[in-house]
């Protein structure tokens, strides 16, 4: 393990931007697994703030950091931090939007949370488990998130007379 840590350190410092970022993520993961959450959060924050790192890695670092810190952050801080990732064009939209919806729930903003869950559920690229969870959450919050084609498919599957 000591040799691996040294190799990761070298990659972090001297590798191409993508390899260096991957090594830095691995080091943050190792810190988190070892129970050093503070160090993991700091490492992920450094990745997120490093303009030499490809944007997709920076966004992932923001998402991971927010996930680790989620229970200790104020809802408004979560919403602000994840705002760029909740753009529908973002590849991180569904994950960031789910955390944002939970933050709105923590603020007592049920209708906004329901709208966000409906947006997550409506996307074709949302993972099936997240889509199902979002449909359920939207429904519990009073938002009909079942799209018309899903309603028609369910209706046509009902037995007739």
Model-derived segments and their meaning:
Residues 1-21:
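Short extracytoplasmic
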Residues 19-24, 28-161:
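Soluble extracytoplasmic domains of inner/organellar membrane proteins
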């Amino acid at each position: 393990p000591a040799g691996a840590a040294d190799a990761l350190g070298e990659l972090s410092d001297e590798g191409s931007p993508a390899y260096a970022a991957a090594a830095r993520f691995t080091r943050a993961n190792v810190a988190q697994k070892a129970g050093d959450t503070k160090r993991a959060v700091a490492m992920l924050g450094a990745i997120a703030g490093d303009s030499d790192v490809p944007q997709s890695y920076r966004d992932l670092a923001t998402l991971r950091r927010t996930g680790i810190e989620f229970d200790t952050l104020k809802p408004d801080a979560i919403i602000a931090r994840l705002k760029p990732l909740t753009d529908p064009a973002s590849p991180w939209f569904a994950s960031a939007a789910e955390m944002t919806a939970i933050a709105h729930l923590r603020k007592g903003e049920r209708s906004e949370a329901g709208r966000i869950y409906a947006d997550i559920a409506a996307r074709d690229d949302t993972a099936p488990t997240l889509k199902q969870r979002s449909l359920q959450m939207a429904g519990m919050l009073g938002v009909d998130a079942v799209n018309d084609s899903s309603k028609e498919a369910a209706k046509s599957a009902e037995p007739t007379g």
